[in-house]
Structure formats: C-alpha cells, structure tokens
C-alpha cells in the first residue's frame, strides 16, 4: 500500500496497485447474463493527472492492463474471462459525480481533514450554519467509502435536536 501511495505522490499510477474489488453478481446474479459476472475495481491512489498531464486513452489502457495484471498474478486465467473493460479516471469521476479529483473520500484522509476538521473546522458535528440543515456523506467524519457511518452519525444528531432517544435510529424514520 505504501508503494502505491508513493507512486501516487510522484504523479503516476502504481505498478503494484492497491485494489478494492467487488463482484455484485455473486449476490445478485440478475445484474449479468446467466453464467457471467460483473466486477468493479476501485484502485486506491490513482493520480488525477499522469506526470502532471491529463489522462490519455493510451494512459487509460495501460493503467487498465496494470490492474488486470495485478489480479491475474493471483488468479490465473483471469484475463481470458474478460469480455469488456472500462477505465474511469479521477477526472471522469469528478465530471460525472462531482468527486473532486475523483476522491471518494471528499478530502484527503490526513489529520488536517479528519475528526473535528471534517468537513471544515466549526462544523464537525453534522449541523450546518442553517438551523435544521444537517450534513452527512463522504465529506463528514469519519470520511468516505460506502459504510453509512456519516449518515448514522448525522441521524443521531438530528434525534438529539428533536429530544428523541437515540437508542434505536430505525424508529426515527417513522417519527419524522
């Protein structure tokens, strides 16, 4: 992981990328034709620019091949099973879903952007400056990924403001 991070700091993708792989068709086979699967890879430390320049088609293809080779090193025959591949760059993620530089964590996971500094100092308890408007998501503590913790934490603060017990957040939906 550290080598991947070091490569990212130098503005390139890692030759030994750190991957999060998901195969949703293992739990929902209706997402692909019978006997086929869909796999998604999230590559940590993918630079928003390569060597200070925008991604090119050649960069995307080479990056995709690096990721495929990383998987194939641990899963012989993997390459032969691929019918289609699509690479999304950080810039494309920014344009498509508003993630600055493709960062799913909505800010670096560094001390100056964590805990009481997330999303910004003074607004770390899920309340915005507007009464009744709460914040949750990747930009709030504890950060991004798909875990739901920021939403749960914001729900607890809403319950506190409504003077409702926080013992069972599921009941709050019916009250609101």
Which residues are covered by each model-predicted region?
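Conserved FAD/dinucleotide-binding core of flavoprotein oxidoreductases
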Residues: 33-70
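Hydrophobic, well-ordered secondary-structure elements that form the walls
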Residues: 41, 67, 71, 133, ...
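Active-site-proximal substrate-binding core of FAD-dependent oxidoreductases
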Residues: 83, 88, 92, 159-176
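FAD cofactor-binding and catalytic pocket of flavoenzymes
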Residues: 1-47, 92, 99-116, 161-165
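A glycine-rich dinucleotide-binding beta-alpha-beta segment and adjacent secondary-structure elements
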Residues: 14-22, 77-141
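Short helix/loop capping segments that flank catalytic or ligand/cofactor-binding pockets
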Residues: 29-32, 50-51, 143-145
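A conserved FAD-binding loop/helix module that cradles the flavin
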Residues: 138-159
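Secondary-structure transition/capping motifs at alpha-helix termini
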Residues: 72-78, 160-165
């Amino acid at each position: 992981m550290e080598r991947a991070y070091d490569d990212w700091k130098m503005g390139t993708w890692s030759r030994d990328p750190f991957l999060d792989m998901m195969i949703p068709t293992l739990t929902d086979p209706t997402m692909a034709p019978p006997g086929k699967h869909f796999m998604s890879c999230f590559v940590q430390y993918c630079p928003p620019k390569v060597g200070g320049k925008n991604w090119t088609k050649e960069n995307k293809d080479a990056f995709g091949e690096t990721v495929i080779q990383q998987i194939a090193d641990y899963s012989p025959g993997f390459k032969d099973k691929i019918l289609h591949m699509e690479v999304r760059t950080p810039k494309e993620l920014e344009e498509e879903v508003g993630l600055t530089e493709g960062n799913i964590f909505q800010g670096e996971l560094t001390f100056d952007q964590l805990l009481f500094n997330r999303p910004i100092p003074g607004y770390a308890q899920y309340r915005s400056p507007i009464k009744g408007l709460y914040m949750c998501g990747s930009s709030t503590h504890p950060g991004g990924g798909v875990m739901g913790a920021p939403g749960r934490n914001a729900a607890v603060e809403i319950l506190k403001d409504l003077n409702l017990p926080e013992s069972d957040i599921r009941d709050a939906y019916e009250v609101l």
